[in-house]
Each structure stands twice: as structure tokens, then as C-alpha cells.
């Protein structure tokens, strides 16, 4: 196996067994004695594939043996296999007829980064967000019962995803209806960032405790049929502790708990799954794996190797670096530390995205004011509300797509009470290769309808910093949404001064056409304006809208064009149209934004071009409307 990033194979490895097992039917024709060799080949294939395309890396390496065992024992796709999140699903894709398409992974018109029902009958449930698998598999199990079907339902969930309340809601309901289903806990002590909280510590005790306890009866029944396995388990103190601690938790929830077992021991896993396959009622198998298994750097640094970029050919000269500014996330991270130094009321909250949201420095400098609540978005928002009630100034750093999961808490717990909570909304707009499940396409629409909410859209790095200060000092709930990636390298002011609320800025004066920009498309709008001599306005605020400026522009221009990287329906452009209608102002409007579709995965630039939000697309749309109006 490779021991460095540079040693990842750049040519497809020789895989005689995998060549015969590119579907589960082919896999099940292999002798069980060949499966460990198959696992080695599949791991090499995964290293090669992700090296060519980039993508999620460590999670898939950790479930090679588990994936083989599941497809070997269960009759997929008739038996329903549901993966949680989907980071670990690449080996599943390779074994289910998509090996020859894996080099199109995460690319335009290629296969998706996550399981998709439209892509394969083996992808029984579309995922991307965490903690949904048990609910989905339970629904499938109940449907099978109603249809008098003997098909099995299996959910594979990581220990990180198990921290979310939704997972426990499903566990509780499954025992209530006595569903015939299997939940497999893939325990690698990781989600994306290292797990936190009581449950993670609870499970971690299986590897450290010296407490001895008798084995659970359910485990004994299964493992006693495995040659040698019961004797090994009997002698293993970690196993004994696992039966006492995690077993108690899940048994109390009404599940028959088995484990923990070694998730890289194929014979034991296959035998255990066979024994559990026909057991009635809710079954829970605890499997311990190592994220990044088989690639030493990923085993040592599972956070850093959660995902990787594609390898460039060894003989390819390095491309000259384009001048660009810092990442928007980095601008936020620096502002957070600066404001924390100036205001000791500030606290930072994240739902398991410390690295992605650039909170590492803050967490080290202000550990007592940093709170990683794990994958628990609803809790994160209401936690912030409680802190705000007592005079703290919480900043919730969260991806746009994940804030959707806490919408009720945002309204009921924060906005209705007019609490001082700032939402730093990262990954707004189109995010690229992860596709529609991770796109931040709707936040302007679902935020601007909330009474009292301050909603801001920065056009560059400096605007982001100023808006964060504005939101922090605002009396009430505030949101700043910013995209993935780097800015245009605007000079950044070091101060913490706020903006005047509800006031846009005219960046270029032109004639006839006014481009009203909400967000980072300002640079593209300026390019277009040079071609058609248009006025360009950085609107800054979606709510409150700069109504006086909108009226002024409507009175002095023949066409108003709104530009945003958000759904057109209900977005910032709709706010402009609604206001003009309320004032009985009839003015031609053109709304440019995300269409009423799910924009499929591709490079961000390709996605923007597809939506007409690059400079060429904006220019073409505006010129077409001008022609229709005779301008």
C-alpha cells in the first residue's frame, strides 16, 4: 500500500478479482477465501480513482471490508442498503456497476459524490446530509411489512452522525414498531472533525477501559456459532467493556446489540451478518473501523485526509498561480478572533465544522468561548438563543445547507424573541462538486421572510468583515451569507466598524440599465457594465432593502436587473419586485439567479455558467432583454 500522497497510483492497478466482482452478483460468486485479496484490490482501486478525481477519501478507505461483507451477505439491491451521509459510499459505487464511470466522479455530467436514487438501483436513498439513514431504512422496513415482503433493510451510520437527535428519534420509533431492520454503527471515532460529547466518549471507552463484565446474551448467541470468535471475544477486555457500556445504551432503547467487532476482519463480519440477517426485530451491530485504513497518512491525519484534491500528472509543469484573495472562511475566522479580543461577550458555536468554517485559531485562542456541539444544528441554534438571553453575543458558524435543518429554531427560538444571534453562513450559493445536497441555494429566500432579521450579502472580503461587525453589533438576529472559495483580493480594513444598515452603494454610474447586485457577482456585473454602459449597485442588504435607492434607480433607468446567487423564487430580486409593486411603480425587471431546478455537480465556474451567472451569461441575458425593450 502507498505510504505517501505521491505514491498513490496514477495508473489503474491490476485487479483480477475486482474485474469479476464489479456487481454484487459477481461478488457473491467469489469464494469467501478470496475476499481479503479483493479488499486489497478494492482499496488500491479507490486510491487510484480518488487520486484522479479528488473527493472524499478517508471514510471510504475505512469501510472497504464492511462494504464487501454487506453486498456478499445481503441480496442487494432487493435488500435495501442505506448509507448515511455518503462520504463512505465510493467502494459501494465501485462494486455496484459504476467502476468504469468513477473517473467522472463529481464532474459535470458524471456520477455524483453521494448515493443518488436516479443513478443506480443500488442507491436506495439519496443522501448528503447526516443522520438520515435510520429513519429512511425504518420507513423501508415498515413498507416491506405492509407489502408482505421479506426484503431486508440495513442502515450504515457513523458515530459522528449518531450524535444528531434525528438518529435517536428513529432508534426510538423502530423499537416502538418492532421493525425488522439492521443498523450498523461504523465507529471510527470521526465524523468530519473529531467527535465531541458524551456519546463519543461513551463509545470510546471500549478501547480503554479495564472493566470486566459478562457478555450480553444476544451477542453470545450469535458469536458462539463463529469458530474461534467467542473465545477471542471472551478474552478481550475491550469487547467485554463494549458489551457493558454501549450495549446497555442501545439495549435500553429496545435494540438487540451485537458487538463491537473488528470492521476490518472479513470472516468475522460475514459470519456475524449471516447470523443476524434473519433475526427478527431491531438489530444493532457495532463495528469498529479505522478511517483512512490502508493509507498511512490518512490513518495518522483523518481530518486532513477527509477529502483530497486530484493528483496532477508527475510530468505536468506547475500552473502559474492566479492572484486571488484569502478564502472567505479565513476572513471570517480572522474577524472572529479580532472581535473576540474586543468584546468578551462573543462566543463561537459550530455544529462539527471547526476546520471548514475556519474556527481552529479561535478555538485555540479562546477555548472557553468556543463550542463545537457536534452534528446537532438544531441544538446549536437554540444553544445560541439561550446564551443570548443571558447577555452573550453568540456567533453561529454554519454552512447554508445545514442551517436549513434548524429553521424552526431560527424562527421560534431566536427571531420571535429578537435575540442577538449572528449567523455566519458559509458555502452560500453553488458549492461545486458536492452538488445540490450541499448547495446554499435558498438562504436569502428563507431568511428575508423572517420579521426583524438583518440579511447581508458581501461582495468581497472587506465587505464581509464589515458586515460581520454590523451583524455582531445589531440588536436582534442577523445573517451574513458568503460563498465557498476566495475573494477578489480586495484590501481588507483592520477595523471593526459597522456599515450603515440598509444602505447600498453605487459602484458605477451608467445609463438606461441598472444592475442591482446582491453578493459576489459584483465583479462580473462591472465587466458587463463596461460593455453596455450600465449603472452598477452593490446592494449589500437584502433586508432591510435600500428602498430609497431602488426608487431612485427606477426613476432614472429603463431596466432594473437584479443579480444574486440564490434561488430566483423568493430571493433578493423578488424583494425588489415586491417593493416596487407596493409603491405602484411599473418598471421592467430582469431577475438573474438560480433557476427552479437542482443544479447538478460540476466545477463552480461551470455551474455559474450553466445558470447564466458568469459575465458572459449576465451580458447575454441583459442584452436580450434590452433588445426586447428597444433599448
Swiss-Prot record:
<keyword id="KW-0414">Isoprene biosynthesis</keyword>
<keyword id="KW-0784">Thiamine biosynthesis</keyword>
<dbReference type="GO" id="GO:0005829">
    <property type="term" value="C:cytosol"/>
</dbReference>
<dbReference type="InterPro" id="IPR033248">
    <property type="entry name" value="Transketolase_C"/>
</dbReference>
<feature type="binding site">
    <location>
        <position position="159"/>
    </location>
    <ligand>
        <name>Mg(2+)</name>
    </ligand>
</feature>
<feature type="binding site">
    <location>
        <position position="188"/>
    </location>
    <ligand>
        <name>thiamine diphosphate</name>
    </ligand>
</feature>
<comment type="pathway">
    <text>Metabolic intermediate biosynthesis; 1-deoxy-D-xylulose 5-phosphate biosynthesis; 1-deoxy-D-xylulose 5-phosphate from D-glyceraldehyde 3-phosphate and pyruvate: step 1/1.</text>
</comment>
<feature type="binding site">
    <location>
        <begin position="160"/>
        <end position="161"/>
    </location>
    <ligand>
        <name>thiamine diphosphate</name>
    </ligand>
</feature>
<dbReference type="GO" id="GO:0000287">
    <property type="term" value="F:magnesium ion binding"/>
</dbReference>
<dbReference type="InterPro" id="IPR009014">
    <property type="entry name" value="Transketo_C/PFOR_II"/>
</dbReference>
<dbReference type="GO" id="GO:0008661">
    <property type="term" value="F:1-deoxy-D-xylulose-5-phosphate synthase activity"/>
</dbReference>
<dbReference type="GO" id="GO:0009228">
    <property type="term" value="P:thiamine biosynthetic process"/>
</dbReference>
<feature type="binding site">
    <location>
        <position position="188"/>
    </location>
    <ligand>
        <name>Mg(2+)</name>
    </ligand>
</feature>
<dbReference type="Pfam" id="PF13292">
    <property type="entry name" value="DXP_synthase_N"/>
</dbReference>
<dbReference type="Pfam" id="PF02780">
    <property type="entry name" value="Transketolase_C"/>
</dbReference>
<dbReference type="GO" id="GO:0030976">
    <property type="term" value="F:thiamine pyrophosphate binding"/>
</dbReference>
<dbReference type="InterPro" id="IPR005477">
    <property type="entry name" value="Dxylulose-5-P_synthase"/>
</dbReference>
<feature type="binding site">
    <location>
        <position position="377"/>
    </location>
    <ligand>
        <name>thiamine diphosphate</name>
    </ligand>
</feature>
<dbReference type="GO" id="GO:0016114">
    <property type="term" value="P:terpenoid biosynthetic process"/>
</dbReference>
<keyword id="KW-0808">Transferase</keyword>
<keyword id="KW-0786">Thiamine pyrophosphate</keyword>
<dbReference type="InterPro" id="IPR029061">
    <property type="entry name" value="THDP-binding"/>
</dbReference>
<dbReference type="Pfam" id="PF02779">
    <property type="entry name" value="Transket_pyr"/>
</dbReference>
<keyword id="KW-0460">Magnesium</keyword>
<dbReference type="GO" id="GO:0052865">
    <property type="term" value="P:1-deoxy-D-xylulose 5-phosphate biosynthetic process"/>
</dbReference>
<protein>
    <recommendedName>
        <fullName>1-deoxy-D-xylulose-5-phosphate synthase</fullName>
        <ecNumber>2.2.1.7</ecNumber>
    </recommendedName>
</protein>
<keyword id="KW-0479">Metal-binding</keyword>
<dbReference type="InterPro" id="IPR005475">
    <property type="entry name" value="Transketolase-like_Pyr-bd"/>
</dbReference>
<comment type="subunit">
    <text>Homodimer.</text>
</comment>
<feature type="binding site">
    <location>
        <begin position="128"/>
        <end position="130"/>
    </location>
    <ligand>
        <name>thiamine diphosphate</name>
    </ligand>
</feature>
<comment type="function">
    <text>Catalyzes the acyloin condensation reaction between C atoms 2 and 3 of pyruvate and glyceraldehyde 3-phosphate to yield 1-deoxy-D-xylulose-5-phosphate (DXP).</text>
</comment>
<dbReference type="GO" id="GO:0019288">
    <property type="term" value="P:isopentenyl diphosphate biosynthetic process, methylerythritol 4-phosphate pathway"/>
</dbReference>
<dbReference type="InterPro" id="IPR020826">
    <property type="entry name" value="Transketolase_BS"/>
</dbReference>
<comment type="similarity">
    <text>Belongs to the transketolase family. DXPS subfamily.</text>
</comment>
<feature type="binding site">
    <location>
        <position position="87"/>
    </location>
    <ligand>
        <name>thiamine diphosphate</name>
    </ligand>
</feature>
<feature type="binding site">
    <location>
        <position position="295"/>
    </location>
    <ligand>
        <name>thiamine diphosphate</name>
    </ligand>
</feature>
